Amino acid sequence: MVIVVFEFEPDETLKDRYFELAAVLLEEVEKIDGFISVERVESISNPGRYVSLSTWQNMAAVNRWREQLDHSQAQDEAKSRKLFLNYRIRVAEVDRDYGPS
């Protein structure tokens, strides 16, 4: 299992555009073989800062998403229009996954 953590701070004037793109991409990511889930939360201590946490079966699934056309085009738009004041992406393999039975 692979977790992708996308921390970001959208430009306040372009935040609506980011969320429009994210809504469209949600429909696309759900079609990717190996996609498990995605959650997005806003920071309590830093309003306007968000974390998107996606879960994947394996790295091959993450790569399929990274190469998906709509996703690539959205990334290009985000870079060219400077939708984000700041962002960081972390990709991690899950060593353990457990909870109550």
Regions found by a protein language model. Give the residues of each.
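Short S/T/G/P-rich N-terminal loop/turn motif that feeds into the first structured element of a domain
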Residues: M1-Y50, Q57-E67, E77, K82-S101
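Conserved short loop/helix modules at catalytic or binding sites
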Residues: A74
